Structures are given as structure tokens and as C-alpha cells.
């Protein structure tokens, strides 16, 4: 073996052992003669440290957070949603641009950055680069500062500072209004609250139906079924907001003119209480404890336009028409979620994944064919379905009974109300299923939910005999950058 190569090899072994095992290195020093060539210092190392000046730093920073975060990191990510946290993220991105040349132009949301940031297309370079690129960078590439620029930071940092800042989402955890609702029943299978398109709230209390105007705060009693020996089990407004349907304990469905306070008709056909109602233009669908779903056109005699849908083996407690009025979703106490169309008397789709009664049903107004459903105490899950293909999509365990679901009209979010054992109201972001807000205040199961016609407020009802109004959703505002006289980059100062 070549002596020079042997000396270099032995020198590397000794250096490695000195860094790992100090006692062994001391022993080697005592055993090595002073005139040995091993002890002579090296003037030129044979290890090369690669230069990473051309690395994709946005991907490298993303790789740091790929592992599971610790509780302290999760707490920091939660704090990052505040104003101070967002300022810290912007400052951190600015430092990465100026010190490391990261080229970040937009501050990412800490809750969605790890989900959506994907590595960009890699550049065609060698695995290791041992010298800087000889190509001269121009001021237009964004990383260098032009000699004629008045800003002390690079072009990429200027774009970062000019990027529009998304306003902080703040949802009040205190209801803006609370109304007393005496005799509001604590029954999971009933639907006693609905909000009309004319901004009038209908509530079934015992044997009566009351109307509350959100514009004038005036309360009127629409009907009293005590004379008939009956009670209210469901209410539902028509799409135009002029008619309200009232389901009764004896199985009748009454149609009332809300403005005139006059009963227009009484529909028969059910043999048990009617707990679910759903309008589709002039057609009214009703679900009952007799396991039957009846569809009737209120403009014609009942027997001429009646359709009987049989598919559930227990009480029907949830009914919702799709936003395009083509499909009807029904949930029952048999843990089934069925989907019907206009042309068939049998369900076109059947989902049996829930482990408890399915009362909470909601069709997405943002994605065609997307259906959400929630299960009772033994299930506690919110499930999402693609009714176009019949495939299940996502599922999340909420930890408590799911009583109601409603999609936001303005954003891809939905709200859920819960019973045993949390009695809470949750706001979710879809499809990430991250929790946006948690509202508490009811002491009983939050069994009833309705949304205002403008889509910004919701009302919840519970067995604690209260109705609580919450500002949950907000209309989308313009993200156009505001031109201010104080803007550093649009005015000469």
C-alpha cells in the first residue's frame, strides 16, 4: 500500500476517534512517537463542504416542519393566528429573504402551509455543488437590490411587504341575542325552529307556533293546536317565505299563510308524528315516525300528486333537498342515509356507515353533489359523501352527538351543533376539517339550528328553553390592496 495514502487514512481514523472517544485519542497520543508522521498537522483537508447557495429554500423550510409537531409547537401555531403571531411570521419570512435568499413573496397561513405547500419542480443541478454559480444575477430576479432602488430590502422582500394581509377571523363566543322559548321540547327527533327568506323566525313551543320578526323583534302567535288536542313536532318555511308548514304529533301537516295568519290546508296521510319537513318549490316532503316519506304538491289535491317513499325501517328524522332541487336526502333512526330522485320510488343511493340515528343533513352550496351528514350519540361522526359517484369522502369524530349541520353561504365552511356530552356549537373549515370556532352556552343538547337569510347569523335552540343568536359567518370582502398615503411603496416620502 502507498505510504502517503496509508498516512492520510490513519490520520482520518485518528481524527474521527478524537471526536467520538476522547479516552481512546489520549491513549493514541501516548503510544504514538513524537517523530511519527501521524502527529504532523495537516495543512490541507480532504473534506469538501457543498455550497447550497442554489438550494430551494422554500422547500427546505417546509421540510423542517414535516415531522409531527410537539405540543409547544402546536401552541405556537395556534398563537400565530393572532395579529402578533402574523407579524412574527412576516418578520421571519423577511429575515429568510435577506439573510438566506429564500425568495418568499407571501406569508403562508400556518394552519394550511404544511398541508398545501408542495415542493416545486427541482432544478437540473448536481446533487452537490462545490462552488458558487458563475452566472451573474440581475436585479430583476428579485433576490438582489438594484443600485438605483431606494428600498434597503430586496425585490422579493418588497413583494412580501406589499402582499395583501388577510384580516383576522374573529368569531364572538357570546350570542348577540338570547330569547326565552318556554316549552321548547328536548326531543332529538323533532325540528322546531326555522328561519324564512323574509327574515322571520318560526318556533314550535308545545301546542303553539310563534313567529318572531328579526327586523322589528315583534312576536306573533300563528296557531294553537290545543283545541285539536294536538302538538307541534316540526316547522318549515317555503322558499319564498310566505308559507309555513306545521307538522303535528297526530301525523297531520298544516299549511299556513304567515302574513294573513290563516290556515290554507291540512294534509293527511301519516299515521304518526311528523318530525321532518323539506320544501322544494311548491312541493312539500314530510317524514314521519311511521317510516314513510310523503311528497305532495300543495297546488293540487293531495291524492293526485302524492308520492310515497319507503326505505327506512324506523322513524324519519332528517330531510333536505339539494341546492339544485334534484335530489332528496333522508336520515332515519335506522342509522341509514338515503338519497332519492324525482323519477324513482326507491332510493338511488344508500349509506349505512353511521352507527346511530342520522338527523343532521346538509348539502353543500359550493360543490355540486357534496353531502354532509352527522350521527347520534353512538356515532358522533360527521361524514361527507360524493353523491355523484356514491363514494364516501371524509369523516371526523366530533366526540359528541351531532344534532344539526349547516353550510355557510359565503365560504367553504359548515357549522355543527352537538348534544351529549358537550352541548357545543362548532365551526369547521372544509376540506381541511380544521376547527375554526367553538361556541358554548347551552346547558342542554343543541337540538335546533337555523340560518339567517343573509347567511351571516345562526340561531340555536335547546331544551334549556332558550334561543341564542350567534354571528358566525361573514360575507367575503374584497381583497384589493388599499392605496394609502402612508404606503411606503406607492408614495414618495
From Swiss-Prot:
It comes from Mus musculus (Mouse). Residues 76-86, 106-126 have a biased composition (Basic and acidic residues). Substrate-specific adapter for the anaphase promoting complex/cyclosome (APC/C) E3 ubiquitin-protein ligase complex. Associates with the APC/C in late mitosis, in replacement of CDC20, and activates the APC/C during anaphase and telophase. The APC/C remains active in degrading substrates to ensure that positive regulators of the cell cycle do not accumulate prematurely. At the G1/S transition FZR1 is phosphorylated, leading to its dissociation from the APC/C. GO terms for biological process: anaphase-promoting complex-dependent catabolic process; cell division; DNA repair; lens fiber cell differentiation; mitotic G2 DNA damage checkpoint signaling; negative regulation of cellular senescence; positive regulation of cell population proliferation; positive regulation of ubiquitin protein ligase activity. This is Fizzy-related protein homolog. Acetylated. Deacetylated by SIRT2 at Lys-69 and Lys-159; deacetylation enhances the interaction of FZR1 with CDC27, leading to activation of anaphase promoting complex/cyclosome (APC/C). Following DNA damage, it is dephosphorylated by CDC14B in G2 phase, leading to its reassociation with the APC/C, and allowing an efficient G2 DNA damage checkpoint. Phosphorylated by MAK. It comes from the Eukaryota. The modification Phosphothreonine is found at residue 32. Residues 31-51, 64-88, 105-166 are annotated as: Disordered. The lineage of its organism: Eukaryota, Metazoa, Chordata, Craniata, Vertebrata. Pathway: Protein modification; protein ubiquitination. Residues 32-42, 146-160 have a biased composition (Polar residues).
Amino acid at each position: 500500500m502507498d505510504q502517503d495514502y496509508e498516512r492520510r487514512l490513519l490520520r482520518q481514523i485518528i481524527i474521527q476517534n478524537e471526536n467520538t472517544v476522547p479516552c481512546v485519542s489520549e491513549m493514541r497520543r501516548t503510544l504514538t512517537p513524537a517523530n511519527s508522521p501521524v502527529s504532523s498537522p495537516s495543512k490541507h483537508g480532504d473534506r469538501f463542504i457543498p455550497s447550497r447557495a442554489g438550494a430551494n429554500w422554500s422547500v427546505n423550510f417546509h421540510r423542517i416542519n414535516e415531522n409531527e409537531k410537539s405540543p409547544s409547537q402546536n401552541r405556537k401555531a395556534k398563537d400565530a393566528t393572532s395579529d402578533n403571531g402574523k407579524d412574527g411570521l412576516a418578520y421571519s419570512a423577511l429575515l429568510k429573504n435577506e439573510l438566506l435568499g429564500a425568495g418568499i413573496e407571501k406569508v403562508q397561513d400556518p394552519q394550511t402551509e404544511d398541508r398545501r405547500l408542495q415542493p416545486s419542480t427541482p432544478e437540473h443541478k448536481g446533487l452537490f455543488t462545490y462552488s458558487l454559480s458563475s452566472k451573474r444575477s440581475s436585479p430583476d430576479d428579485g433576490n438582489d437590490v438594484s443600485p438605483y432602488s431606494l428600498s434597503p430590502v430586496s425585490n422579493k422582500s418588497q413583494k412580501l411587504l406589499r402582499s395583501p394581509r388577510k384580516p383576522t377571523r374573529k368569531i364572538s363566543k357570546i350570542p348577540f341575542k338570547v330569547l326565552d322559548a318556554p316549552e321548547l321540547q328536548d326531543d332529538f327527533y323533532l325540528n322546531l325552529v326555522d328561519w324564512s327568506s323574509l327574515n322571520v323566525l318560526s318556533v314550535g313551543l308545545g301546542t303553539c307556533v310563534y313567529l318572531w320578526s328579526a327586523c322589528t323583534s315583534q312576536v306573533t302567535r300563528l296557531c294553537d293546536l290545543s283545541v285539536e288536542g294536538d302538538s307541534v313536532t316540526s316547522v318549515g318555511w317555503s322558499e319564498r317565505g310566505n308559507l309555513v308548514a306545521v307538522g303535528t304529533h297526530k301525523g297531520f301537516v298544516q299549511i299556513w299563510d304567515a302574513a294573513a295568519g290563516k290556515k290554507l290546508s291540512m294534509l293527511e296521510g301519516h299515521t304518526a308524528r311528523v318530525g321532518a319537513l323539506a320544501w322544494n318549490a311548491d312541493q312539500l316532503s314530510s317524514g314521519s315516525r311511521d317510516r314513510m316519506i310523503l311528497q305532495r304538491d300543495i297546488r293540487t289535491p293531495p291524492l293526485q300528486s302524492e308520492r310515497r317513499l319507503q326505505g327506512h325501517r324506523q322513524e324519519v328524522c332528517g330531510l333536505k333537498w339539494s341546492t339544485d332541487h334534484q335530489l332528496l336526502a333522508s336520515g332515519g333512526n335506522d342509522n341509514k342515509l338515503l338519497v332519492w330522485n324525482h323519477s324513482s320510488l326507491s332510493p338511488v343511493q344508500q349509506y349505512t356507515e353511521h352507527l346511530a340515528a342520522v338527523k343532521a343533513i346538509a348539502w353543500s352550496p359550493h360543490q355540486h353533489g357534496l353531502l354532509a351528514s352527522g350521527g347520534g350519540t353512538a356515532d358522533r361522526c360527521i361524514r361527507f359523501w360524493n353523491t355523484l359517484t356514491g363514494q364516501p369522502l371524509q369523516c371526523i369524530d366530533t366526540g359528541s352527538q351531532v344534532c344539526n349541520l349547516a353550510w355557510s353561504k359565503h365560504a367553504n365552511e359548515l357549522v355543527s351543533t352537538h348534544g351529549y356530552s358537550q352541548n357545543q356549537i362548532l365551526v369547521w373549515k372544509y376540506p381541511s376539517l380544521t376547527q375554526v370556532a367553538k361556541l358554548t352556552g347551552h346547558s342542554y343538547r343543541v337540538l335546533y339550528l337555523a340560518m339567517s337569510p343573509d347567511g351571516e347569523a345562526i340561531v340555536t335552540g335547546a331544551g334549556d328553553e332558550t334561543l341564542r343568536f350567534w354571528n358566525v359567518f361573514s360575507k367575503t370582502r374584497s381583497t384589493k390592496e388599499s392605496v394609502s398615503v402612508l404606503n411606503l411603496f406607492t408614495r414618495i416620502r
